[in-house]
Swiss-Prot record:
Region G2, residue ranges: 60-64
Protein name in the entry: Elongation factor Tu
Family of this protein: Belongs to the TRAFAC class translation factor GTPase superfamily. Classic translation factor GTPase family. EF-Tu/EF-1A subfamily.
Spans annotated as G1: 19-26
UniProt keyword Metal-binding present: yes
HAMAP family on file: EF_Tu_B
Keyword list, A-Z: Cytoplasm, Elongation factor, GTP-binding, Hydrolase, Magnesium, Metal-binding, Nucleotide-binding, Protein biosynthesis
Binding residues for GTP: 19-26, 81-85, 136-139
Subunit-structure text: Monomer.
Pfam families: GTP_EFTU, GTP_EFTU_D2, GTP_EFTU_D3
Subcellular location: Cytoplasm
Function: GTP hydrolase that promotes the GTP-dependent binding of aminoacyl-tRNA to the A-site of ribosomes during protein biosynthesis.
Length: 396
């Protein structure tokens, strides 16, 4: 069978299901594909197809993730679902499957559980912009007051982690009812209502090309008679010939002008997100720029040395450390294109971090790096990856 052509005529959005084990994340994912397939916006993917998620490697970490795609009348969605809790932790921290929004699945019969809390906290730490809640298994709860109680608990928990708990849409239903066609109101109708809420409540992400220009420096050359050329892949935005840019990170921020952009040895008038380019910089000496800095739109990114992060530490089996580490641990932090040494400060009450743990920590780098919230990094020891992290907030 020929692969259906992917029509990009609708805005695209990346979402995922999160929540406690056995609350029905995978069943809901299957139910969404089933209900939308009837409207011609998806291919039904059964539970057992989603559940045997293939393993992927992201930043040297093995993660099992299932991907399904579907569309509503308004949007095209790529949806990720993970089989195990550890896969969620790794996925969210590495950003392997980027989430523009999440569907939090909570069993009405059990209410919020430890991983419900942990996934909400992770969503906050890694900067998931919006959450919609599906209260699942409502066919197992006869008492409407009990349902209200669970809903209140979920809203309080979301507010505790700085999500707008009072405003978040909560849809009551049953993924199983949708899959078995047993109760239209709790099944199919609830799933359609959920997708309406996801369409309306999860904001459309800004495309990389519309964001302010940023390009990590990979290499620097000096071309006699022309000046200094900096190469790299444009991460976001557009850079036009003649524009003023800043060189940020590692040393004092410098301003310069892009006097040429080339790609595949051809001169262009601009480079944009996704392009591998060489940028010719006016009056910049070869020794003024180095790998690990970024070129960016003036004022858009600042260099920082101190930040709070959420990190996942690899297990021995994943090729990570064999032993725990303590506060004042000094590994390298690999941001975009370079390693920078930093010192780890563990939160009060955390004695040590074991391989396989995820942890909130504070990091002090020895030189400043261009960074902002949500920036991903690897933690390395002598070139070997021992962890992955994401900038949760900047201190200075």
């Amino acid at each position: 069978m020929a692969k259906a052509k992917f029509e990009r005529n609708k805005p695209h959005c990346n979402i995922g299901t999160i929540g406690h084990v056995d609350h029905g994340k995978t069943s809901l994912t299957a139910a969404i594909t089933k209900v939308l397939a009837e409207a011609g916006g998806a291919t039904f993917t059964a539970y057992d197809q989603i559940d045997k998620a293939p393993e992927e490697k992201a930043r040297g970490i093995t993660i099992s993730t299932s991907h399904v795609e579907y569309e509503t009348p308004n949007r095209h969605y790529a949806h990720v679902d993970c089989p195990g809790h550890a896969d969620y932790v790794k996925n969210m921290i590495t950003g392997a499957a980027q989430m523009d929004g999440a569907i939090l699945v909570v069993s009405a019969a059990d209410g919020p559980m430890p991983q419900t809390r942990e996934h909400i906290l992770l969503a906050r730490q890694v900067g998931v912009p919006a959450i919609v809640v599906f209260l699942n298994k409502c066919d197992m709860v006869d008492d409407p007051e009990l349902l209200e109680l669970v809903e209140m608990e979920v809203r309080e928990l979301l507010s505790k982690y700085e999500f707008p708990g009072d405003d978040i849409p909560i849809i009551k239903g049953s993924a199983l009812a949708a899959l078995e066609d047993s109760d239209a109101k709790l099944g199919k109708e609830a799933v359609l209502e959920l997708m309406k809420a996801v369409d309306a409540y999860i904001p459309q992400p800004e495309r990389p090309v519309d964001q302010p220009f940023l390009m990590p420096v990979e290499d620097v050359f000096s071309i006699s008679g022309r000046g200094t050329v900096v190469t790299g892949r444009v991460e976001r935005g557009i850079v036009k010939v003649g524009e003023e840019i800043e060189i940020v990170g590692i040393r004092e921020t410098q301003k310069t002008t892009v006097t040429g952009v080339e790609m595949f040895r051809k001169l262009l008038d601009q480079g944009q997100a996704g392009d591998n380019i060489g940028a010719l910089l006016r009056g910049t000496k070869r020794e003024d720029v180095e790998r690990g800095q970024v070129l960016c739109k003036p004022g858009s990114v600042k260099p920082h040395t101190k930040f709070k992060a959420e990190a996942y530490i690899l297990t021995k089996e994943e090729g990570g450390r064999h032993t725990p580490f303590f506060t004042n641990y000094r590994p390298q932090f690999y941001f975009r294109t370079t390693d920078v040494t930093g010192v780890v400060h563990l939160p009060a009450g955390t004695e040590m971090v074991m391989p396989g743990d995820n942890v909130a920590m504070e990091v002090h780098l020895i030189v400043p790096i261009a960074m902002e919230e949500k920036l991903r990094f690897a933690i390395r020891e002598g070139g070997r990856t021992v962890g992955a992290g994401v900038v949760a907030s900047i201190i200075e």
